Amino acid sequence: MSAIAGINGDVWTSTSPSTALGSSESCTDSGNHINYFTATHQAWDPTQTLTVQNSPNGSTGWATVTDYVFYWPVGEIVFNTARSVGTNNFTRISAGSYFTLSALDGAHAWKMSVKGMTKDVTPFQASGSWAVNLATIKSMTFSVDCFRQDGRILTEMGTTNISGGIILCQLWWDEANGKRWQFYALPTGISQNIVANDVDKQSINMQASGPVYIITSNTFSTTTVIQE
């Protein structure tokens, strides 16, 4: 893989509140009749009701279904079994709420760290006297440095703490080609630095909440949207 200039990166976040869907949104079949991706909006609000429907032809006979898993941060529907062509292979979301994202202006650097946690489960007489460890959970934290002084993330922090909301984050390393990390997160800290002979700066720290995705294209498919 060739080097990528850091200038190609970016940071995007959602803002509260989410927006209720005004009309049904179609979903694109990945080709296996199991994985479908929402056609227009990527990030959906997990605190709001979502209704998924199937149709035999995409225009009539829409019926609400519940035999699926929905991956909210990327708008992916995964059905328990493949849809049948001519019976129920057209899919749409008839009710739900989505997040609107925009660039965190002034952002100039981001740094993330993924960790896997383990638990020592070494028994007596362990082979070779080696410790035995069990993988438990994964976590991700990240920070963003900005040339900005405003309350955008501070407001989101207040909203999430009071109402139990969430923020959708995109950490791009190659925005032009759609390459980024995408996930829900909660802000954990905000610091500001004002120096007379420098520019105003703001640093933001956040913690991922739920699955983290690597996305390698703006065209979503089972090969370009990867859950870590």
Question: Could you describe each region identified by the protein language model?
Answer:
Residues M1-D67, W72-T87, G96-A103:
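Extended beta-strand solenoid/passenger and fiber regions
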Residues T100-L104, R148-T188:
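Short, acidic/charged, Gly/Pro-enriched secondary-structure junctions
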Residues G86-F90, S139, G164-I166:
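Extracellular Ig-like/FN3 beta-sandwich strand-entry sites
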